[in-house]
Amino acid sequence: MKQTIRLSSGGGWGFWAGWALAFLGFPLGGVAAAALIGPITTPLGGAIGGIITGAIVGAAQWLALRRRLSLTRGWIAATALGMGAGLALGIALLGTSTDGATLPLRGLIAGAGIGSAQFILLRAVGSRAPIWPVVVALGWALGWMLTRAAGVDLTLQWAVFGSSGALTFQLLTGLTLAWMLRGHAVAPGPAAVL
């Protein structure tokens, strides 16, 4: 099925409040992954934990985005699969250390997986959509750095960063969405095949 993204005239404060509240998907997803599979210590664990967490984060984001964009539930699947692949690849390449640059680099890889998968669905939004994977990758790395700086115990090998990182990530991506959508009509034609 082909999907064309259409902008809704609705939005405003309700949309942005929903996008801000979507940060709750991060701690809920992290707790769900921890409860179901425990610490994320292997690429396989990263893939499974990423899919679980990504599905919950993606669902929270989709609930907010569907008010402004005519996205399908494919957003949830894209987020889950992108996070599973990105987290598994990051662990395979860099291990599970939370010290030094390893943590934000692994976050950059996971974020690139998520952002690239979501971009497939956002590409019909307009000419600014290619910035999305870059912002998500950088935001994911920043989220991990802020979580570490806030003193969260990262030895528990969480699948996703904490609330401080999630709030910052949602702010950064929300501002990016506002910039992407401002004054742009959706290009006609197919956006993605799902």
Model-predicted segments: where are they?
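Juxtamembrane/disordered regions of integral membrane proteins
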Residues: 1-194
